[in-house]
Swiss-Prot record:
A molecular function (GO) term: potassium channel regulator activity
Entry keyword annotation includes Endoplasmic reticulum: no
Protein name as catalogued: Cysteine-rich venom protein VAR10
Signal sequence residues: 1-19
Family: Belongs to the CRISP family.
Entries under SMART domains matching the protein: SCP
Keyword Membrane: no
Keywords: Calcium channel impairing toxin, Disulfide bond, Ion channel impairing toxin, Neurotoxin, Potassium channel impairing toxin, Secreted, Signal, Toxin
Gene Ontology CC, one term: extracellular region
Species assigned in the record: Varanus varius
UniProt domain SCP: residue ranges: 41-169
PTM remark: Contains 8 disulfide bonds.
Lineage, opening ranks: Eukaryota, Metazoa, Chordata, Craniata, Vertebrata
InterPro entries xref list: Allrgn_V5/Tpx1_CS, CAP_dom, CAP_sf, Crisp-like_dom, CRISP-related, Cysteine_rich_secretory, SCP_CRISP, ShKT_dom
Disulfide bonds: 77-156, 95-170, 151-167, 189-196, 214-231
Length: 231
């Protein structure tokens, strides 16, 4: 059965935090390879710590094309104007998106950690433990098959929350039908123990979850078999 995919564009709105005022916008530009490494390392470090553990969590890597897409989203300066699915479709793959806004610049590690900390109100397989609380940033950060990421920041001086950080993830997570199961529970790398880097799988397959059976089909016949053409 084909499921309608629900790719959530998510925004975290946080006010000024202490200890962040020494940063400058230039310190956070994602054209800097050091910043790219910080973003990737932070995501991968957090993905290794999910509880319950994940047997199929992919290792993330940086993608400049996705970063350019995230930059276009950041230039809008308005989290209410969500990036359309068409604009977030890169190479035929629909990507997910997380937003973060703040009154003062924050390190990328801090912003990503804030998304991840939504897990404090999340129960695997159930969803939010408090009605209405946001958990979609967390589930996107730890979505098992989102293995490419690109991020950007923009200064929006007309707004009180003027620092606008955007990350896009490909393939996107938060898929309808399993958005509260962002990965499969099991021993780290148990899905592909020969393709493993410290608990993260290194055998990505860029397919969309158009069918509930896509993960099993892809495992059996690979990414390029006609059976998985619509995965």
């Amino acid at each position: 059965m084909i499921l309608l995919k629900l790719y959530l564009t998510l925004a975290a709105i946080l006010c000024q935090s202490r200890g962040m005022t020494s940063l400058d916008l230039d310190d956070l530009m994602t054209t800097n390879p050091e910043i790219q490494n910080e973003i990737i390392n932070k995501h991968n470090d957090l993905r290794r710590t999910v509880d319950p553990p994940a047997k199929n969590m992919l290792k993330m890597s940086w993608d400049n094309i996705i970063a350019e897409s995230a930059k276009r989203a950041a230039l809008r300066c308005n989290y209410k104007e969500h990036t359309s699915i068409a604009e977030r479709t890169i190479g035929g793959v629909v990507c997910g998106e997380n937003y973060f806004m703040s009154s003062n610049p924050r390190t990328w590690s801090s912003s990503i950690q804030s998304w991840f900390d939504e897990r404090n109100n999340f129960m695997f397989g159930f969803g939010p433990t408090i009605p209405g609380v946001m958990v979609g940033h967390y589930t996107q950060v730890v979505w098992y098959k989102s293995y490419k990421v690109g991020c950007a920041i923009n200064l929006c001086p007309a707004q009180s929350l003027k620092y606008f950080q955007v990350c896009q993830y490909c393939p996107g997570g938060n898929v309808a039908g399993r958005k509260y199961e962002p990965y499969t529970i099991g021993e780290p790398c148990a899905a592909r123990p020969k393709d493993c880097d410290n608990g993260l799988c290194t055998n990505p397959c860029a397919y969309n979850d158009d069918y509930t059976s896509c993960p099993d089909l892809t495992k059996q016949v690979g990414c390029h078999h006609p059976v998985t053409a619509n995965c």
